[in-house]
């Protein structure tokens, strides 16, 4: 113990001050745990690790590892959600590390693995099971697991590591089932995720089958939706233009449509995806992974038709080509394996037309 001098109201007072190291039990604790997660940087996915250490000391919650604001905000989301399931954060020093530290971590997909690794450090779930588990998902204030973008691309990267089990939001289960015969479990809440981790191998398999059956029953009506692409055979007239379109589609050539307004140029362009060859399973995976990374994958199911992208002629270079500090796909990328239609091209600025002048349909 040492003494410090404080001046209060003009009077000198000697106050005792205790060094933290003098308190018993302040030595470093052994509550350490690790889990596997997935991250997305542009269209590139990678496998990440989330580590937590809970030790004695002043209560704090530190998150390190080159994190974006979306990841740092998980601190408050998890504080409330863990309290909702009667697993409040301990009044100790909590340090969470996200590796690899050289890659910017963005998005909300790290919420679920962070919550699970904290629960394991508190003894709520077996820590040894998390080392063979891969998890992504956003955690709400009410402990519900919400949909995240890029699950399809992240699962492709995680599949190379051959983890024992994969934990994703239930709303993303369609993307997980499309990757292949992976042991993917879709969960709706943090309690369900804890139940799955604590269950035996046979019980986990039963829970995965039940989740798949629930998703299939909900997605049955959504998968039987009408085609979006207009039928090329319903176009009347314009025989020369239709022949030019068929030649361009057969050879994947560029096509320039010129003519007065109202002659059917836009309708002809919208029908082009319908006469292109059907996408293979590999192409469906590619296109769906791009739209999943962009957060535009509808209903969590694979895209079956070739995309048709028609940006406005006033679109910016950033929106057209993509990019940014945290790269995001642009219109050109969204038209992968499909048709990019530049309407009113004469009104577009030259810096918009130049990046796309060598693109084929």
Q: Where are the regions a protein language model picked out?
A:
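Peripheral, non-AAA+ core regions of ATP-driven protein-machinery
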Residues: 3-7, 18, 22, 26-256, ...
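Single conserved hydrophobic/aromatic residue that forms the stacking wall/gate
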Residues: 138, 350-361
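Walker A/P-loop
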Residues: 257-296
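The Walker A (P-loop) glycine that initiates the GxxxxGKT/S ATP-binding motif of P-loop NTPases
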Residues: 259, 322, 344
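Conserved P-loop NTPase mechanochemical-coupling segment
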Residues: 296-299, 303-314
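Short glycine-rich substrate-engagement loop in P-loop NTPases that contacts/grips substrate
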Residues: 311-334
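Conserved AAA+/SF3 P-loop NTPase catalytic/coupling segment centered on the Walker-B
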Residues: 329-353
């Amino acid at each position: 113990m040492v003494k410090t001098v404080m001046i209060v109201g003009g009077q000198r007072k000697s106050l005792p001050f205790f060094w933290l190291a003098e308190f018993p039990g302040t030595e470093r604790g052994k509550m350490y745990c690790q889990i596997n997660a997935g991250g997305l940087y542009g269209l590139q996915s990678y496998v990440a690790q989330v580590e937590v250490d809970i030790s004695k000391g002043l209560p704090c919650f530190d998150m390190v590892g080159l994190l974006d604001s979306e990841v740092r905000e998980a601190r408050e989301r998890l504080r409330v959600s863990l309290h909702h399931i009667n697993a409040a954060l301990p009044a100790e020093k909590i340090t969470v590390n996200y590796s690899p530290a050289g890659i910017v971590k963005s998005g909300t997909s790290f919420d679920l693995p962070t919550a699970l690794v904290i629960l394991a450090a508190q003894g709520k779930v077996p820590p040894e099971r998390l080392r063979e588990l891969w998890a992504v998902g956003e955690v709400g204030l009410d402990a519900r697991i919400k949909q995240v973008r890029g699950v399809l691309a992240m699962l492709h990267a995680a599949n190379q590591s051959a983890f024992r089990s994969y934990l994703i939001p239930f709303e993303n289960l369609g993307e997980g089932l499309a990757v292949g015969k992976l042991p993917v479990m879709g969960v709706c809440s943090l309690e369900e995720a804890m139940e799955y981790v604590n269950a035996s191998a046979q019980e986990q398999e039963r829970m995965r089958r039940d989740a798949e059956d629930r998703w299939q029953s909900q997605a049955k009506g959504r998968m039987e939706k009408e085609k979006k692409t207009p039928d090329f055979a319903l176009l009347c007239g314009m025989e020369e233009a239709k022949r030019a379109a068929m030649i361009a589609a057969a050879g994947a050539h560029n096509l320039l449509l010129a003519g007065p307004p109202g002659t059917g140029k836009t309708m002809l362009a919208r029908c082009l995806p319908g006469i292109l060859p059907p996408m293979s399973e590999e192409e469906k995976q590619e296109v769906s992974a791009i739209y999943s990374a962009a957060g535009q994958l509808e209903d969590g199911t694979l895209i079956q038709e070739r995309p048709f992208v028609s940006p406005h002629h006033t679109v910016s270079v950033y929106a057209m080509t993509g990019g940014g500090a945290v790269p995001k796909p642009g219109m050109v990328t969204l038209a992968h394996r499909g048709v990019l239609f530049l309407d009113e091209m004469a009104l577009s600025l030259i810096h918009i037309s130049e990046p796309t002048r060598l693109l084929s349909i």
